[in-house]
């Protein structure tokens, strides 16, 4: 963990804060404009304070290396430690260091996406039904270890389908749905 990794991680945590506020918010890189971050870097534990610019809601994230986790909640705490790992692992709070080598969120390649609510999920599932009802079409899959799934995680709302938005010069906005599958241990 270094100061640059933590700076890039703070942008991801801004988006996680937006999901904590509204689990069905449309996520894109413009979400960063709603938040300010304060980073107190330390080799053992780094505190990242994310504050909403309008309502001043504050969330404090404690960031640890995977080798030295000593988590105790603080005021306005997120509720779980954020762990920087050496390789990709299950868990919404575990970010591999290779995710943090570049500023992923501000990149032009960062997608625009949203979690589907139960009504939208039911509509997608009904569209996937074939004529006889015995077979269903399947959506493309994405693993629960992908950064989009880690961002959209909420403990009380299961994530089954993620909708991505892509700009198209001819048709406007295209949508692409992907189903989330779990990774075996």
Swiss-Prot record:
The EC category is transferase
Q: Which domain of life is it from?
A: Viruses
Q: What Gene Ontology terms describe what this protein does at the molecular function level?
A: DNA binding; DNA-directed RNA polymerase activity
Its BP terms in the Gene Ontology are: viral transcription
Q: Does the keyword Nucleotidyltransferase apply?
A: yes
State if Transcription is listed as a keyword. Answer: yes
| Keywords associated with the record | DNA-directed RNA polymerase, Nucleotidyltransferase, Transcription, Transferase, Virion
Known catalytic reactions = RNA(n) + a ribonucleoside 5'-triphosphate = RNA(n+1) + diphosphate
Q: Which Enzyme Commission number(s) are on file for it?
A: 2.7.7.6
Subunit (UniProt): The DNA-dependent RNA polymerase used for intermediate and late genes expression consists of eight subunits Rpo30/OPG66, Rpo7/OPG90, Rpo22/OPG103, Rpo147/OPG105, Rpo18/OPG119, Rpo19/OPG131, Rpo132/OPG151 and Rpo35/OPG156. The same holoenzyme, with the addition of the transcription-specificity factor OPG109, is used for early gene expression.
What protein is this chain from?
DNA-directed RNA polymerase 22 kDa subunit
Question: Which organism was this protein described from?
Answer: Variola virus (isolate Human/India/Ind3/1967) (VARV)
């Amino acid at each position: 963990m270094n100061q640059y990794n933590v700076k890039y991680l703070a942008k991801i945590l801004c988006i996680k804060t937006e999901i904590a506020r509204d689990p069905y918010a449309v996520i894109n890189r413009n979400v960063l404009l709603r938040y300010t971050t304060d980073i107190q870097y330390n080799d053992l534990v780094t505190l990242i304070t994310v504050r909403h610019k309008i309502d001043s809601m504050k969330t404090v994230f404690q960031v640890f290396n995977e080798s030295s986790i000593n988590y105790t909640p603080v005021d306005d705490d997120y509720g779980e430690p954020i762990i920087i790992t050496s390789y990709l692992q299950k868990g919404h709070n575990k970010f591999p260091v290779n995710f943090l080598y570049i500023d992923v969120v501000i990149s032009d390649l960062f997608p625009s996406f949203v979690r589907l609510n139960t009504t939208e999920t039911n509509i997608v599932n009904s569209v996937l039904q074939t004529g006889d009802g015995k077979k269903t079409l399947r959506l493309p899959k994405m693993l629960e270890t992908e950064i989009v799934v880690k961002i959209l995680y909420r403990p009380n709302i299961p994530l089954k389908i993620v909708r991505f938005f892509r700009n198209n010069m001819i048709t406007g906005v295209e949508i692409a749905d992907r189903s989330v599958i779990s990774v075996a241990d």
